[in-house]
Amino acid sequence: CTAGLAARVGALPPIPAPVYDKRVDGLTLPWLEGSMDGANRVADGPMGALAMKWLEEKGITGLGIGVNGYRELTNSKRPITSPDDMKGIKFRVAGTKMYLETFKLLGANAVTMNFGEVFTSLQQGVIDGKENPTAIIDSSKLNEVQKYLTMWNYSFDPLFLCINKKLFDWLKALYPVWSR
């Protein structure tokens, strides 16, 4: 879902969202909330409303915020039970400065890479682990190349349901009964 003409309606995952407005990262701050109820309160509350406003300023009309889960850890080296366990492990993290800095502060070797390269990189030992919501871990079969899963709910992964603002305005004019 972009402000341009290529995409009209869709879901905007949290990682590209800050490309449109860096303030959107605020919804994914590490350990902001540790439960799904808390994540829903953040998405449905003032922070979610602000994120939608910021995207609107960039030509993206938000229709709602879905919940993609929490970002969890997998790795092939050892169980992670404390920050010390992360030392020396090379993790692929989502490409935002916030995630890179978080992992570095925890002592991990944090790198970014295209998600399409992750499975092969894990197989070949280029990286030792990564972080994603469990739905992505499962659907991408990453559990086939990772021995350890750490459920630490460190970052809420919202899914912005959105539409190009120009298209939405046109549809509202065409169908005046539409409302959000």
List each language-model region with its residue ranges.
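N-terminal secretory/targeting leader peptides
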Residues: 1-38, 46-180
